[in-house]
A protein has these predicted regions:
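Residue(s) in the substrate-gating loop at a strand-loop-helix junction
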Residues: 149
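Active-site helix of classical SDR
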Residues: 129, 165, 173
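Canonical Rossmann dinucleotide-binding motif of NAD(H)/NADP(H)-dependent dehydrogenases/reductases
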Residues: 3-35
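Amphipathic alpha-helical dimer-interface segment in Rossmann-like NAD(P)H-dependent oxidoreductases
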Residues: 75, 116-138, 177-182
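Active-site Tyr-X3-Lys motif and surrounding loop/helix of classical short-chain dehydrogenase/reductase
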Residues: 72-79, 98-108, 112-119
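A glycine/serine/threonine-rich, flexible loop-to-helix segment
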Residues: 102, 183-184, 197-220
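Catalytic Tyr-X3-Lys loop
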Residues: 93, 107-127, 141, 145, ...
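Conserved glycine-rich Rossmann-like NAD(P)H-binding loop of the short-chain dehydrogenase/reductase
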Residues: 32-47
Length: 220
């Protein structure tokens, strides 16, 4: 099946990261106007510079946990490009204090890091859905893609905070899909992807030894 996305407007939160950057590139290469959002200005600038030769792309500094920041981004995009057709929520991550080492139990987990991880991964998905989803509700069409995780489906890793947050993302996605279709328009779709492990900046040292071999954690 061939999809023609040329001229559509997409937002990719966390676009400075590995996953978000890959998705943003694919969209740009298919003729989509892409707004990359990230709280890290250096990562944002680097990604825009990487992709601008492939098509129309802009970078918008944005905090996915700050509603005012998200609303300002929405109004800018609507003023410049007229619509918001696609939202891909890839902003997220983990923290050492919310990850259990082999010699630790759940009682060693830092509750502060647990709270930060659940806030970023769950609310950092919910808030953009509410802000940019409003534009889709108003225009009667759009597609939201959230990033869940295989860790939300089974307790397969030592990442309790991340797993809890991604479980929340999964059920919120299902709920929002019904809400949008029943109360606004069936042309508004909300789905989630559940990737497995892949190497990124946040987990490279945990999964790969300095000599390039796999760590004990990555072999489990």
């Amino acid at each position: 099946m061939e999809l023609n996305l040329k001229g559509k407007v997409a937002i990719v939160t966390g676009g400075g990261g590995v996953l978000g950057g890959s998705i943003a590139r694919s969209l740009v290469e298919n003729g989509v106007k892409v707004a990359i959002m990230d709280i890290r200005q250096d990562k944002l600038d680097a990604r825009v510079n990487e992709l601008k030769s492939f098509g129309e792309v802009i970078g918008i500094p944005c905090n996915v946990l700050d509603k005012a920041s998200l609303e300002a981004a929405r109004e800018r995009l609507l003023a410049e490009w007229g619509s918001i057709d696609i939202l891909v929520n890839t902003a997220g991550g983990n923290l050492p204090g919310a990850t259990l080492r082999e010699d630790q139990t759940v009682f060693d987990m830092k509750i502060e890091d647990f709270n930060r991880v659940t806030d970023l991964n769950m609310n950092g998905t919910v808030y953009p859905c509410l802000v940019f989803g409003k534009a889709m509700a108003d225009q009667g069409s759009g597609s939201i893609v959230n990033i869940s995780s295989m860790a939300a489906l089974s307790a397969i890793t030592r990442v309790p905070g991340y797993s809890v947050a991604k479980s929340g993302v999964s059920i919120f996605t299902q709920w929002l899909a019904m809400e949008m279709a029943l109360k606004f328009n069936e042309k508004i779709r909300v789905n989630a992807l559940a990737p497995g492990f892949f190497i990124g900046d946040q987990n490279r040292a945990v999964l790969i030894n300095p000599d390039g071999t796999y760590t004990e954690r990555s072999r489990k």
